[in-house]
């Protein structure tokens, strides 16, 4: 290898190492800060806002209103757990059984990819990472998930998730969603309304709360049944999530 190539390789290696250190400090600081402080915006919100501006849409505003867990209807937390991650109170960020099922399904159905991300993984991804599929992003997501599971309580993870989840075009967080679609605060959401909001996750740009398709209504009904089977509101109290 020539001297010039060695110099370039050495420069790139030093740059990547420094970048990794900067990102580790940034993400570590974010995990520590947001264990107690409200989250003002997420990486997904920034990505959506920048994309809108680049496409000339200057009216788009990625909007979120932070609310604490006691300002959110317990039905909402139960609905997303029933819909997205029923083992949320038990696992340490990853649902191994669901991952194995998803891998088996994806091998048989290459055109219909199924995910197995837990609420913890989705929180890490939405808060700190870019959208898309890649092994690099999944690796970073795994590390960040372990970080928030180590530092945050389950209640804190659920609180952040509900405040940064995307529920429609420019609608982030359950408070903004409740106001937009039901004209009420998140604390007043009914069981059925909570299930409808959860039914569009994790693809709220395809499935609409404001114009629910037959699939969304079917999923809403399924979520309501799962909420009942989990035990209703006592489930949230039992696991100290309310």
From Swiss-Prot:
The protein's UniProt keywords, in alphabetical order, are: Cell inner membrane, Cell membrane, Cell shape, Cell wall biogenesis/degradation, Glycosyltransferase, Membrane, Peptidoglycan synthesis, Transferase, Transmembrane, Transmembrane helix
Its protein name is: Biosynthetic peptidoglycan transglycosylase
**Which pathway, per its entry?**
Cell wall biogenesis; peptidoglycan biosynthesis
Q: List locations, semicolon-separated.
A: Cell inner membrane
Concerning its family, UniProt says: Belongs to the glycosyltransferase 51 family.
> Transmembrane stretches, by residue range?
19-39
Top enzyme class of this protein? transferase
The reaction(s) this protein catalyses: [GlcNAc-(1->4)-Mur2Ac(oyl-L-Ala-gamma-D-Glu-L-Lys-D-Ala-D-Ala)](n)-di-trans,octa-cis-undecaprenyl diphosphate + beta-D-GlcNAc-(1->4)-Mur2Ac(oyl-L-Ala-gamma-D-Glu-L-Lys-D-Ala-D-Ala)-di-trans,octa-cis-undecaprenyl diphosphate = [GlcNAc-(1->4)-Mur2Ac(oyl-L-Ala-gamma-D-Glu-L-Lys-D-Ala-D-Ala)](n+1)-di-trans,octa-cis-undecaprenyl diphosphate + di-trans,octa-cis-undecaprenyl diphosphate + H(+)
What role does it play?
Peptidoglycan polymerase that catalyzes glycan chain elongation from lipid-linked precursors.
State the Gene Ontology terms under molecular function. Answer: pentosyltransferase activity; peptidoglycan glycosyltransferase activity
Q: How does it sit in the membrane?
A: Single-pass membrane protein
Give any single GO term for biological process: peptidoglycan biosynthetic process
Q: Which GO terms describe its cellular component?
A: peptidoglycan-based cell wall; plasma membrane
EC assignment: the record states 2.4.99.28
State the NCBIfam families in the record. mono_pep_trsgly
Task: Supply the Pfam families for this chain.
Answer: Transgly
Q: Where does the protein principally reside? A: membrane
């Amino acid at each position: 290898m020539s001297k010039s190539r060695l110099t370039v390789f050495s420069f790139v290696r030093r740059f990547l190492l420094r970048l990794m250190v900067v990102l580790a400090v940034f993400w570590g600081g974010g995990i520590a800060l947001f264990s107690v402080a409200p989250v003002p915006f997420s990486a997904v919100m920034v990505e959506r806002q920048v994309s809108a501006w680049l496409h000339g849409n200057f009216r788009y505003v990625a909007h979120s209103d932070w609310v604490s867990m006691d300002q959110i209807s317990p039905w909402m937390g139960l609905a997303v757990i029933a819909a997205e991650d029923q083992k949320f109170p038990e696992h340490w960020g990853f649902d191994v059984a669901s991952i194995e099922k998803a891998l088996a399904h994806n091998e048989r159905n290459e055109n219909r990819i199924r995910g197995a991300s837990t609420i913890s993984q989705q929180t890490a991804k939405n808060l700190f990472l870019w959208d898309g599929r890649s092994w690099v992003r999944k690796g970073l997501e795994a590390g960040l998930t372990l970080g928030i599971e180590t530092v945050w309580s389950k209640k804190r993870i659920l609180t952040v998730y509900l405040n940064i989840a995307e529920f429609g075009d420019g609608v982030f967080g359950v408070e903004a969603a409740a106001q937009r679609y039901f004209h009420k605060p998140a604390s007043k959401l009914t069981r059925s309304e909570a299930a409808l909001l959860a039914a569009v996750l994790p693809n709220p740009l395809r499935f609409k709360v404001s114009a629910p398709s037959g699939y969304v209504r079917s999923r809403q009904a399924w979520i309501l049944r799962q909420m009942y089977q989990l035990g209703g509101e006592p489930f949230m109290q039992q696991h100290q999530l309310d």
